[in-house]
């Protein structure tokens, strides 16, 4: 508390001293403002960059030295024994001869019969009767006078005395009632002219093209043995007959090699008329069985015209035979 009172007393004394020493200006002279001059009391700092002295020496890199512990490999050529080739031994297959039964195709649907519809020409009956115009029956007008005939009496007239007592007449337009028009009898125009309908035959439904193919079996007849030939081929020869029985535009199609059962299959897509086509034997890969025979027309060719059903998708021919000798195999094969 003593310190606070002493400091308060010192502040009061200093304020009184400043009031006593203050100059009082006369109200006539305005004060002159002088800007203060600020002089730095401290010198400007001088920047000295720090000097870093490394305390450790720079590292020295010594690359490692790798010493192989293994000796380099020595390559020597392998001494392999020469391969011994043993040719395969082909034995005749011990399969029984297949018995081929040609399938019988029975059409399940009868061919459609197109009949032309009998259309009767339309008869247009008017729904309204034509108007009948009748002349109006008008009775002649008879005018009957309503006045009796005048009686001529001799008037006793005095001489007229003219007195202008009447005003001049005023003419007014008569007001006539509006005319009444009678409606004419109602007349409906006839129906517009309609041309006769043209008959358009019904369009036939779209029938997709039937893909036809040829299939058969090629066998080898060697004595009394008969077995199928794998890799044999047949050919289809198609020609168009010209004048004097001369063929022209002959097309030959070769089948794919037969399978292990001796079966071949050929798809005929680009030939429309199959009646001039024949199926014949072509080649056999078996050296001991390469002579074609005419059994089931294997040489002359099986014509497609012998098939009466034109809706067949697969034509089965054969079986055809190759033989080892020059003699042909029997006409009826025996298994």
Swiss-Prot record:
Ranges for the Sequence repeats: 30-34, 35-39, 40-43, 44-48, 49-53, 54-57, 58-62, 63-67, 68-71, 72-76, 77-81, 82-86, 87-91, 92-96, 97-101, 102-106, 107-110, 111-115, 116-120, 121-125, 126-130, 131-135, 136-139, 140-144, 145-148, 149-153, 154-158, 159-163, 164-167, 168-172, 173-177, 178-182, 184-189, 190-194, 195-200, 201-207, 208-212, 284-288, 319-323
GO cellular component, one term: extracellular region
Disulfide bond positions: none
Region feature (39 X 5 AA approximate repeats): 30-323
Subcellular location: Secreted, Cell wall
Keywords: Cell wall, Repeat, Secreted, Signal
Chain's role: May contribute to cell wall structure in root hairs.
Entry similarity comment: Belongs to the plant proline-rich protein superfamily. ENOD12 family.
Protein name as catalogued: Proline-rich protein 1
Species for this entry: Arabidopsis thaliana (Mouse-ear cress)
Gene name, Swiss-Prot/TrEMBL: PRP1
């Amino acid at each position: 508390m003593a310190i606070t009172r002493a400091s308060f007393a010192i502040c009061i004394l200093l304020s009184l001293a400043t009031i006593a020493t203050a100059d009082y200006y006369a109200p006539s002279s305005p004060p002159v403002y002088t800007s203060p001059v600020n002089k730095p009391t401290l010198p400007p700092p001088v920047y000295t960059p720090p000097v870093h002295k490394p305390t450790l020496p720079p590292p020295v890199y010594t690359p490692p030295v790798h010493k192989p512990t293994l000796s380099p490999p020595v390559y020597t050529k392998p001494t392999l024994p020469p391969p011994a080739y043993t040719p395969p031994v082909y034995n005749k297959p011990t399969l029984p001869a297949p018995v081929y039964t040609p399938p019988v195709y029975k059409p399940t649907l009868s061919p459609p019969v197109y009949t032309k519809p009998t259309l009767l020409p339309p008869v247009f009956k008017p729904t309204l009767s034509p108007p009948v115009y009748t002349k109006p029956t008008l009775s002649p007008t008879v005018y009957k006078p309503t006045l009796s005939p005048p009686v001529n009496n001799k008037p006793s007239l005095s001489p007229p005395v003219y007195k202008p007592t009447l005003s001049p007449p005023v003419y007014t337009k008569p007001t006539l009632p509006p005319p009444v028009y009678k409606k004419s009898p109602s007349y409906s125009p006839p129906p517009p002219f309609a041309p006769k309908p043209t008959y358009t035959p019904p369009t036939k439904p779209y029938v997709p093209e039937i893909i036809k193919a040829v299939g058969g079996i090629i066998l080898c007849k060697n004595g009394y043995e008969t077995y199928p030939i794998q890799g044999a081929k047949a050919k289809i020869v198609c020609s168009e007959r010209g004048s004097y029985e001369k063929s022209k535009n002959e097309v030959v199609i070769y089948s794919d090699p037969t399978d292990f059962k001796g079966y071949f299959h050929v798809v005929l897509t680009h030939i429309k008329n199959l009646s001039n086509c024949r199926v014949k034997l072509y080649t056999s890969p078996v050296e001991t069985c390469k002579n074609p025979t005419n059994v089931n027309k294997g040489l002359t060719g099986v014509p497609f015209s012998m098939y009466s059903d034109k809706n067949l998708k697969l034509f089965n021919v054969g079986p055809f035979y190759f033989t080892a000798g020059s003699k042909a195999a029997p006409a009826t094969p025996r298994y």
